[in-house]
Structure formats: C-alpha cells, structure tokens
Amino acid sequence: MATLIKKPKLRAAGIVFRFAHRGATNYATLLKHYRAVFKMPQPVVSRLTGFSPRSVAKLSEGETPSSKQEKALVEMDRLLDGLSRVMEPAQIGHWLKQPNQAFDGSTPIQLVERGEIDRIWRMLYDLESGQPG
C-alpha cells in the first residue's frame, strides 16, 4: 500500500509572504506573533479561524495552510488590525473571551463562531467614527 506524502508548497522567488507586515516569514512565526502580541493562545486561534486544534498545531510547526485556511487567517488578521485601532493589542486575546453587553452577553469569539462577525465590525465602525452605539 502506497503512502501519500504531502509535498510542501513552494513560493515563487520574489513573492513577499502575505503576512510580512507582522514581521513573520512563515506561518509558524505568524502564529508565534499572534501569541506574543495579541496574547492569543492556540485555542483562541482555533476558535477564531474555525481550524481544529491539530491544524493550528501543524501550522505552528511550519505546515503550509490550504487556500481556505489562508483565507481564514487573512480574515482573522484583518479583525486583529481593526481591534488594534481601538484597544491595546495585548488586551485583544482577553477581550475576545469576555462576555460583552454590546453583544447581548455573548463573547466576541462566540459571535465569530456563529458567523456574526459583522456585529464586531459594526462596533468598530461606531467606535472609530464617533457614532453612538
């Protein structure tokens, strides 16, 4: 019985890593950055992206994500950028897990899991524009 071995995806020369603005050169250093700067342990990354804990662990070890996984990482990265504009980055991991009256007692991470991330984006818009919430 033949064993299928996944070959790592190669990047074309000269193409900049999509998350280079985070100081990351690969997905392992990107996830390390999230843990350090945003205080987001692996379970939080797992819940925000919808990845299994095992998938997050593999990415942390340097595995290249699928295009679907990369899209989820981009969406999470955009959310972290938005949240960083209204709070200290080191508070984000904690904030994501706290029940919030603005979200009817749900935690922001629960909103993401339920597909209601638009409620977080609306809150960010209101905070940044000075609109009453």
Over which residues does each language-model region extend?
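Non-transmembrane "mature" sequence context
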Residues: 1-133
